Amino acid sequence: MEPQLILGSSSPRRKSILQYFRIPFTCISPSFEERSVPYQGDPAAYSQELAVGKAESIVQDHNPEGVILTADTVVIYKGKVFNKPSSRDEAIEMLKTLSGQTHSIITSVALLQQKKLMVGQETTQVTFNQLPEKYLGRYVEAFSTLDKCGGYSTQEGGGLIIHNIQGCAYNVQGLPIRTLYHLLLEFDINLWDYLV
């Protein structure tokens, strides 16, 4: 019997990563309001709370039978969380701050089925090139970065801004495959069985 997997996300990047496998899944956007959760200084706990909140909102709104998969990614630099920018100007300021620096990306992945909840995390270090300020507005507009935490994308023009990535590149895109693989095993779903 095929597993019922529900991707609780509107992220095209997470959907694309999951489509690397033949595992059937449906998408439901969570109603959880991320900005309702205040950041209290622990980025790992914050990311986990958001991922779990998204999964619980899907249960509350839809009560599906399958395994719900949600994730939350945060960018951290010098103790500050960089969420999705709310404006072009905020995205540009984020890029200026991260220019030439190394920051952390934490993604929490939550799987929830009925009362069974499993959560995992991945942390990756990303170092930016020195960014020419006069082009940052163009970058934000060209790659529609307002829906991406930290105001940037590794897939679209990432080579212009990223010097190197230490750790899981899929984590930077919002869904670390290694973490997902281990969590799915707890629900008797093996990604090796779903290779394309």
Curated annotation (Swiss-Prot):
Its EC number is 3.6.1.9. Disulfide bonds: none annotated. GO terms for cellular component: cytoplasm. Keywords: Cytoplasm, Hydrolase, Nucleotide metabolism. One of its GO terms (biological process) is nucleotide metabolic process. Coiled coil: none annotated. Belongs to the Maf family. YhdE subfamily. This is dTTP/UTP pyrophosphatase. It comes from Chlamydia caviae (strain ATCC VR-813 / DSM 19441 / 03DC25 / GPIC) (Chlamydophila caviae). The lineage of its organism: Bacteria, Pseudomonadati, Chlamydiota, Chlamydiia, Chlamydiales.
